[in-house]
Curated annotation (Swiss-Prot):
Its EC number is 2.1.1.33. The gene is trmB. Pathway: tRNA modification; N(7)-methylguanine-tRNA biosynthesis. GO terms for cellular component: tRNA methyltransferase complex. This is tRNA (guanine-N(7)-)-methyltransferase. NCBIfam families: tRNA (guanosine(46)-N7)-methyltransferase TrmB. The active site is at 143. Catalyzes the formation of N(7)-methylguanine at position 46 (m7G46) in tRNA. It comes from Shewanella sp. (strain W3-18-1). Coiled coil: none annotated. SUPFAM superfamilies: S-adenosyl-L-methionine-dependent methyltransferases. The keyword Lyase does not apply. S-adenosyl-L-methionine binds at residues 68, 93, 120, 143. HAMAP family: tRNA_methyltr_TrmB.
């Protein structure tokens, strides 16, 4: 039985932290995933502490830092880190097999600019990331909670938008993607109303998939099912 923090919000977008106990059915680690965690965690793993990271110490350099919330199995995150060696990348994922897979792929790819948390993303963002320190925050294909009674569980809410804004540098970007059209409309409504942001779309809607975001398995699945994919990018201006 695992204690897992789940995000829940009231009708005004106020973040309500709730602790729910449930069995985390994430599957067993493969041998390769377990070996990757054992061998790569000392180098790429970040142990959670409620103290802001010193990014220059963590990465051994000064560089723009990109943070991804919920990287799944990590394939696209590793690809981004490989494609942009001049940037630092931090990924957060609660599912251990995903962490193991990401570390395995990162080791094979030889990336040195990636660090990983196996922890609740809200706690990391709130306490372990310094204000004004990030060049980009990425949230790709979050759970859409498509039933109306579950909409309050969606992570993109007014208070979350403000939390992300506080962690971005001026000029930093909050980049979201979803294959659920109604959720994209919800994201757009929340973000267009969020103070201190500017929509990077020319018509204040969505943007084409930028080159820096690789196609993911979720996106491929959406295409197979005849779904579209919507990218939203909002720049912190204040």
């Amino acid at each position: 039985m695992s204690e897992v923090t789940t995000a829940e919000f009231n009708e005004e977008g106020k973040y309500l932290r709730k602790i729910r106990s449930f069995v985390l059915r994430e599957g067993r680690l493969t041998k390769g995933q377990a070996q990757a965690i054992e061998s790569q965690w000392p180098t790429m793993g970040l142990d959670y502490s409620p103290v802001p990271l010193n990014l220059s110490e963590v990465f051994g350099r000064e560089a723009d830092t990109v943070l991804e919330i919920g990287f799944g199995m990590g394939a696209s995150l590793v690809q981004m880190a490989k494609d942009a060696p001049e940037q630092n990348f931090i990924g957060i994922e609660v599912h251990k097999p995903g962490v193991g897979s990401c570390l395995s792929d990162a080791a094979i790819a030889g990336v040195t600019n990636l660090r990983v948390y196996h922890h609740d993303a809200m706690e990391v963002l709130e306490h372990a990331i310094a204000d004004g320190s990030l060049a980009r925050v990425q949230l790709f294909f979050p759970d859409p909670w498509h039933k109306k009674r579950h909409h309050k569980r969606r992570i993109v809410q007014a208070e979350f938008a403000e939390l992300v804004r506080s962690k971005l540098k001026i000029g930093g970007v909050f980049h979201m993607a979803t294959d659920w059209e109604e959720y994209s409309e919800h994201m757009l409504e929340v973000m267009n109303a969020a103070p201190g942001y500017k929509n990077q779309s020319v018509d204040d809607t969505v943007v084409p998939r930028p080159d820096h975001r690789p196609l993911t398995k979720f996106e491929a699945r959406g295409h197979r099912l005849g779904h579209g994919v919507w990218d939203l990018m909002f720049e912190r201006i204040v």
